[in-house]
C-alpha cells in the first residue's frame, strides 16, 4: 500500500477554535474552524477532510482556492503563500451517520419512547469526518470548542463548561480550552443523561453518565472505581491527573469496549455499568479493568502521545499492564493477575506462535492499515506482559521512577 504524506510535516497547528451546530433530526451538522499554525512549505496548506462539504476557506483573512486530494486531503491555495505562521478559517458541513465513527447517534428507549444521544468516535483517523484538521497524533494543539444543540439536554466535552446560554431556540455550550492534545482525542456527547458525581482527594470532579434507560444504582460501582483509580495513578506515576474533571459515559451504541477521549471517556454500557441486583464478580472485574485501562490512557497516550501509529504499543501495552496493577492494588482479594495469566497471556502466546504474526511495534504507511494493528493479543497482551517482566526485572521503585521521568520529559 502506497505511503501517504504526513501532513504534520507540512503544517503544524497550534490552536483550533471549533464551532459546530448539530442538527440531530436532520442528521447533519455545520461548523466553522479557525486554525492557527506554522507552515513549513510554500504555496499551499493541506488539511485532512473526509466526507465534509467545504463552503469557504480563508488564509490570513484572504480567500483561498480549494482542491481535494484522493487521500482525504483538502488543499488550500493562495498566491504568494509562504512558510511561517498563518491563520486559517474554514466553513464546512457534514453528515451524522450510523457508522459509529465521526459524529453518530446512539439509540435507546425510555418507557417505550425512542430517544437518541449524539456521540463521537475519532480514533484513529475519524476527526477529519467532523472538522478539517491535521488528523495525526503528533499534531497536538489546544482546542476551544463550542457546540450548538437542541435545548434541555446534557452537553459534554473534553473540558468543563465555560459558558452556556440559550440563543434562537437552541443551546450554545462553550468549553474551557484544552491542554495540547491530538485530534483523535477530541470528543463530545449530547443528549438526555443522568449522572452521579464524586471528587478525588486532589479535587478532580469524577462523573459517571448513562441514559435514563439504566437504573441509577448501576452507576455506583463505576464511580467508586474511577475515583480510586485516579487517586492510585496520581500516586503511582508521581504526575497528577492533568484535567479538572473526568467524565465516564455509557453509550447505548459503541463499536469497541471504550475510548480514552481526554476528560470524556466513552464506553459500551456493559463495560461501565454494573447492576448491583444481578451482577456477577466477573462482570465487576471486567468493568473495573476497562475503567482502569482507559484512565491509564489519560497519561499513556493523552498526556504523552506517540508520533505515529507504529508506536501504538506505547499507548496500549502500558495501559494493558497498568489496568492490572491498579485493580490488583484496589482489590487484592480478586487475584487479578491470575486472570491475566490464564487469559491474556495464553492468548498472546497462541497468537505469537503463528507464522507472520505482527510485532509489537509495526510500521504503518497508510491510515487504512491502522485498524489492523489494534491486535489485542499482541499490542495489548504481549506488550503488557513484556512490560510486567521489565517491572519485575527493574523493581517497582525504579520502574515508577522511570515512568515519572517519561511523563515529565515528554
Predicted segments with their positions:
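Acidic/His-enriched low-complexity segments
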Residues: 1-245, 270, 275, 375-378, ...
Amino acid at each position: 500500500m502506497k505511503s501517504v504524506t504526513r501532513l504534520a510535516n507540512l503544517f503544524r497547528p497550534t490552536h483550533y477554535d471549533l464551532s459546530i451546530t448539530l442538527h440531530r433530526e436532520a442528521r447533519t451538522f455545520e461548523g466553522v474552524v479557525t486554525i492557527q499554525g506554522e507552515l513549513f512549505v510554500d504555496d499551499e496548506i493541506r488539511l485532512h477532510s473526509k466526507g465534509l462539504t467545504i463552503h469557504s476557506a480563508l488564509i490570513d483573512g484572504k480567500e483561498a482556492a480549494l482542491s481535494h486530494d484522493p487521500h482525504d486531503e483538502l488543499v488550500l491555495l493562495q498566491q504568494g503563500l509562504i512558510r511561517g505562521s498563518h491563520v486559517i478559517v474554514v466553513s464546512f458541513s457534514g453528515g451524522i451517520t450510523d457508522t459509529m465513527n465521526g459524529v453518530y447517534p446512539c439509540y435507546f428507549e425510555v418507557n417505550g419512547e425512542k430517544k437518541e444521544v449524539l456521540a463521537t468516535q475519532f480514533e484513529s483517523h475519524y476527526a477529519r469526518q467532523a472538522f478539517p484538521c491535521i488528523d495525526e497524533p503528533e499534531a497536538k494543539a489546544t482546542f476551544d470548542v463550542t457546540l450548538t444543540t437542541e435545548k434541555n439536554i446534557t452537553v459534554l466535552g473534553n473540558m468543563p463548561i465555560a459558558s452556556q446560554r440559550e440563543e434562537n431556540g437552541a443551546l450554545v455550550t462553550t468549553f474551557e480550552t484544552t491542554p495540547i492534545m491530538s485530534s483523535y482525542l477530541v470528543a463530545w456527547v449530547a443528549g438526555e443523561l443522568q449522572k452521579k458525581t464524586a471528587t478525588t482527594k486532589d479535587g478532580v470532579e469524577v462523573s459517571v453518565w448513562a441514559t435514563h434507560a439504566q437504573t441509577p444504582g448501576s452507576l455506583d460501582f463505576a464511580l467508586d472505581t474511577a475515583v480510586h483509580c485516579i487517586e492510585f495513578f496520581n500516586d503511582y506515576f508521581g504526575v497528577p491527573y492533568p484535567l479538572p474533571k473526568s467524565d465516564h459515559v455509557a453509550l447505548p451504541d459503541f463499536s469497541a469496549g471504550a475510548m480514552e477521549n481526554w476528560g470524556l471517556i466513552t464506553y459500551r454500557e456493559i463495560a461501565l455499568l454494573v447492576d448491583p441486583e444481578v451482577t456477577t464478580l466477573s462482570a465487576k472485574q471486567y468493568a473495573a479493568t476497562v475503567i482502569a485501562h482507559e484512565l491509564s490512557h489519560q497519561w499513556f497516550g493523552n498526556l504523552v502521545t506517540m508520533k505515529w501509529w507504529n508506536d501504538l504499543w506505547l499507548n496500549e501495552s502500558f495501559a494493558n499492564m497498568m489496568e492490572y496493577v491498579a485493580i490488583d492494588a484496589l482489590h487484592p482479594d480478586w487475584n487479578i493477575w491470575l486472570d491475566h495469566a490464564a487469559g491474556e497471556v495464553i492468548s498472546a502466546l497462541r497468537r505469537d506462535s503463528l507464522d507472520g504474526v505482527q510485532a509489537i511495534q509495526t510500521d504503518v504507511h497508510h491510515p487504512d492499515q491502522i485498524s489492523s494493528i489494534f491486535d489485542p493479543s499482541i499490542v495489548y497482551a504481549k506488550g503488557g506482559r513484556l512490560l510486567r517482566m521489565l517491572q519485575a526485572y527493574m523493581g517497582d521503585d525504579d520502574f515508577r521512577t522511570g515512568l515519572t521521568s517519561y511523563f515529565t520529559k515528554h
